[in-house]
């Protein structure tokens, strides 16, 4: 198992407790430089530590990938992972959704892809969803415009009363059920 994520000692112990024969290689942060070079700045700045530039040589990183049969990854990921990990059979991604993998070469390949759907903090995302509903229902975008303009135009507000309304939640997975 090759971990491209920074994992804690507790997480390492949990993985190795599954089977003592598991060889776990911790390469968390090793590929950050490559990720920074291949993803837009807004992505790498948000998801990578500011001083993360990777570790090891290109040859060492290529060797790690070439030998990996199972990879634990995250977001953002290496776009050319399948091409470089010829023995790869299984890629597990920590984020819940897999559609973000469309950009890379894993999508549509022979590699089994799994995600951590259901093990994240879905309640926090559901609360952000409710906050978004309230944001627009109460006219907060107009309030921002008024604040910038330095005046309040009460006629521009059309707040919506949410009480008694019915909402349709499409795709009621873990987050949708919490909403």
Outline where the language-model segments fall:
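N-terminal glycine-/charge-rich "phosphate-binding" loop or analogous flexible N-terminal tail
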Residues: 1-70
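Generic structural signal for helix capping and beta-alpha/helix-loop junctions
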Residues: 32-34, 100, 123, 150, ...
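Short gly/ser/thr-rich secondary-structure transition/capping motifs
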Residues: 49-56, 71-75, 147-155
């Amino acid at each position: 198992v090759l971990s491209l994520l920074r994992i804690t000692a507790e997480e390492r112990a949990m993985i190795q407790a599954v089977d003592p024969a598991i060889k776990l290689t911790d390469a968390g942060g090793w590929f950050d430089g490559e990720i920074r070079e291949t993803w837009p700045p807004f992505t790498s700045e948000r998801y990578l530590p500011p001083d993360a530039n990777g570790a090891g040589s290109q040859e060492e990183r290529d060797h790690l990938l070439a030998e990996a049969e199972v990879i634990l990854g995250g977001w953002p990921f290496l776009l050319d992972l399948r091409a470089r990990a010829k023995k790869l059979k299984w890629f597990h991604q920590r984020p819940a959704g897999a559609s973000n993998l469309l950009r890379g070469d894993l999508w549509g390949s022979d590699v089994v892809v799994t995600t951590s759907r259901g093990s994240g903090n879905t309640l926090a995302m559901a609360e952000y969803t409710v906050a978004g509903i309230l944001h627009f229902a109460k006219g907060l975008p107009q309030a921002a415009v008024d604040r910038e303009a330095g005046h309040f135009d009460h006629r521009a507000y059309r707040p919506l009363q949410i009480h008694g309304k019915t909402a349709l939640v499409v795709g009621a997975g873990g987050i949708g059920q919490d909403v």
